[in-house]
Amino acid sequence: MLNKFCKKPLYEVTRTMARVAMGVQKAETVIKNARLVNVCTAEIQEGIDVAIAEGRIALVGDASHCIGPETKVIDASGQYIAPGFMDGHIHVESSMISVGEYAKAVVPCGTTGIFMDPHEICNVCGKDGVRIMIEDAKRSPLKAMSNAPSCVPAVAGFEDTGAAIRADDIREMMTWDGIMGLGEMMSFPNVIGAEENIHAELAETLKSDNIITGHFSIPDTGAALNAYIASGIRCCHESTRAEDVLEKMRHGMYALMRYGSAWHDMPVIIKAVLDNKIDDRFACLISDDTHPDTLINEGHLDHIVRCAIKEGLDPIKAIQYVTINVATCFRMDHEMGSITPGKCADIVFFDDLQDICITRTMIDGDVVAENGQMCVEIGPANFPEHVFHTMHVGHPITAESFRIAAPAGAGKTVKTRVIEIIPNRVGNYERLLDLPVKDGFVEPDAGQDVMKMVVFERHHETGTKGVGFLKGFGFKKGAMAQTVSHDAHNLLVAGTNDADMALAANTLVECGGGMCAVADGKVLAVVPLPIAGLMNDLPVREMAELVAKLDAAWKQMGCVINSPYMTMALVPLACLPELRLTNRGLVDCRTFRFVPLFAEE
């Protein structure tokens, strides 16, 4: 199975590798006189040649004897070469584009492989959604390796999703081509609590000899972390403190340090490496969630590597964190992750080690991108019709749908549980605030930066909804709505008044899902996401333009935080601390219990 991500399996071409290395058979391509970033020994080797045949590296050293009349020679004098970059944890759906369009954005940035967790579309479309993503990936040269979603729903019993995944589904998916392991195990309470179905999922993965990826988001480095790792979980991307990273690596867990469009954990947690004299083979850099405007304006892993270097990380180490360390984490280092004989010829070229900007990307020995542009054609997408029909709210949404009745006997104010977001972080705070009551209904309070929020179930026409209040976005007017609302991806609406909230909600119902901003009875911006309410197959630049218009609309309404729609999308995710709102109600994610909206109740 592992060889399916290379042009040819090594067992088919071992004789060719030997012949080319010895010069008996000439190489298809030779890279001459490069500065090799050797991720195996953490050194720069000057004047290195690389001979390539059948998509693999046959020789590293002096390749003069490997050059024949038909050999393509690439003069890399003065340039650095490194293994292709790999993202160890990514949700392509968060980029709002198909895998094929995603490849067009990231391959020119030096990304040659990703380990994607398609649990967003799985929450809407079930296992079929995972197959759709795997199939879509086949139209591009990007090595889009997939993990089977583990927690659908994210935390059972707290929300309603479009589908559910159980151990027998995991057993089936582990037999699929393209599946590398189990997606992030978000249900850490059930792991450490030895819940039967969750541990059955772990067992099915381990029996298939695949790896389990993690999501341990609580600040516990004692018995709970040990129980989690001892259950077979190999890596985690949810560290928000340097001590979390350090303890995870000390316990043999790969620490995937995140730097996405909205989650800027890396500058804080990389201090685990910078401030301690430790072996960092268990450290990786990942993106998790990246918006199209970030991909266009800043880049992908190349951007994260540059940011890590600016934080003080040695450039060679930064490159190791997106190459050999990732490959080893996923037990793929025998195939990729280094420029060494026998490995896939996934290679990136750049001029400056301190400011890494990719000039050429090679995958399986073929130059697929150069100077920021793809060199190969990627065919059109072909999605099944049913993924374009996933908005099943089941009842009319009007301004009255957003009224929140005050408890009996309430005075002019009522003490209310409010979710306060933390910009650029995945966590939030529970606050108890006095909110105004008018004509028997609880109102938003712009003076406290508090707006109203409702989550409507949109998969099975159940008519259920959760109501709450939200602080920290800075809205002075208007409303927003989005169907990108992790992980159930129900219809999330927040705003300052009921009329604008209703208009925002109905705008998305009519267009099949997406994100929109509304103010004063007018739609300011819409990002249509008709594929499961999560993605569009428009080119990434067109999507980036739509997102930029949405961002401008949010600013017009008063919100100036970074990637606010991504922060908003996490408000319903009931596996992250502290307080969340799903279609079933408010969830205290420290105790995993529903709590009343009003503190007096």
Question: Where are these predicted regions, by residue range?
Answer:
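Solvent-exposed alpha-helices and their adjacent loops that cap or buttress functional pockets
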Residues: 22-24, 43-44, 66-67, 136-138, ...
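Active-site microenvironment of metallo-dependent hydrolases
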Residues: 1-48, 52-53, 58, 107-109, ...
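Divalent-metal coordination cores built from histidine and acidic residues
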Residues: 2-20, 25, 100-211, 523-528
